[in-house]
């Protein structure tokens, strides 16, 4: 894989949806909990799959999971799980669907404990600031970090599913807590 394609991090290639996600969302700091919950749902769904697979089903996930409203998702029932097993807009994996409901309940508990999921996430970062890495090659970007290790360990202890350190690291990249845009990427120095 090329490090830079058309001025961008090479992982997004030339797929229009992927490029738009890279340019408009990935690595930009997210402070609102609704979007953080959306990324948590989508990143968890990605486990074992490619990100582009989930990105292409994003609107299906939005429809299936109450526009990513954690309170509504937390109230979903076994009947909802059965309904979603027949919904074409998402990956039909019973364990992942059920874990999304469980994770929503745990997400709400974290909000109550920390004031917001954003505050909870920042608690794993030195000086409570996002990390800006200075990688020049895609091969330098790690799949996890001390922050993702600690956060995923804490989340697992709380009962979260499908959110190991690698998925957690991807979540932190997506939501701008870790900026891994390559130094030569056109998005590198854009206002976050």
Locations of regions flagged by a protein language model:
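HhH-family (HhH-GPD) DNA N-glycosylase catalytic core used in base-excision repair
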Residues: 1-192
